[in-house]
Amino acid sequence: MRSLFKKFIAIMTLSTIFITSANAVYVYRYQQEKTQWCWAASAQMIGHTLGRQVTQTDIVTQVKGMDINDGANDTEMKNAVTYATLRNSVLRSSAWPFASATNELSTGEPFLIKLTWYKNGETNGAHAVVASGYNIASGTLTVVDPGYRCGTKAFDYNSMITNCKFQSGTGKWTATIYV
């Protein structure tokens, strides 16, 4: 009987450790509707998760003043998240520490990650994705990519901030937008 009790306690302890080491926010994935609209799709996903339904066209028109297939700078992405969520958003011009990212996701709020692509050491474009979960034990963040033929996938945090092969390109996390 004692042995059975010890096994039960061990299983419960491991279960508790596992449950507290991982978390996920359900983020409905919207594919970007135009080739340069990853930022609008990412803002749309965050807005949807936080209870607001807006279209990518609405977001682009609000931020750019017209329906145009154009990328966005950091301030425009921040404005897109603010519009999509009707909440003030904050732009951090760098990656978050892993602990900050997991804390934000623990509150049930996904956030936008700007990925900067590099080729031969030079900046070669950028892409917006949404962080939706984490696993402390494996040191990963789950990313929802609005790009064509992409989806939801976990990536090693240390690779994300240095040089990582994401679903839609190779680069690193260079900015964060959260509410």
Where are these regions (language model features)?
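Hydrophobic core
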Residues: 12-20
